[in-house]
Amino acid sequence: MCHAREASPGTGEPEAAPRDNFPREAGSKRGIGAAFETRAQRFLERAGLALVARNVTVRGGEIDLVMRERDGTLVFVEVRARANSRYGGAAASIGARKRMRLLLAAHAFWARTGGANACRFDVVAFEGGRLVWLRDAFRADDAG
């Protein structure tokens, strides 16, 4: 599987949002998730990444966003949102099982597209009115 290039950690950027992050117009959990994925996509595009795919589903897993860095690196993005960090926050909610599912889906996508590019796994977390971008949040060998 692909391995990440050296990357510096991203920094959180405050973003205008309701105090608890959750858009009022979205009624369903799926609608809320889609709204956060759109916000994450726009943020990453402003940071210079290009959208490759959204909601890539393969047997055993799903990837919220697949982006591409200017240097060609594929970036598999998990978008997480929590109203508060009482139970560990958005980023902490990605356990070993979820990482394994992300890795399986990413590997299938990566192989289907030729497997030539470097890649990494990022998390965009929405917590307490802030968007936090965790670049290179985990690696393929961290899954278990």
From Swiss-Prot:
Disulfide-bonded cysteines: none
Domain of life the protein comes from: Bacteria
Pfam families: UPF0102
Biased composition regions of type Basic and acidic residues, renumbered to the chain: 16-28
Residue span of region Disordered: 1-28
InterPro entries for the chain: Restrct_endonuc-II-like, tRNA_endonuc-like_dom_sf, UPF0102_YraN-like
A single GO molecular function term of this UniProt record: nucleic acid binding
Gene3D superfamilies: 3.40.1350.10
Homology family: Belongs to the UPF0102 family.
Entries under NCBIfam families matching the protein: PRK12497.1-3, YraN family protein
Xref: PANTHER family: UPF0102 PROTEIN YRAN
Protein name: UPF0102 protein BPSL3274
Organism whose genome encodes this protein: Burkholderia pseudomallei (strain K96243)
Lineage per the UniProt record: Bacteria, Pseudomonadati, Pseudomonadota, Betaproteobacteria, Burkholderiales
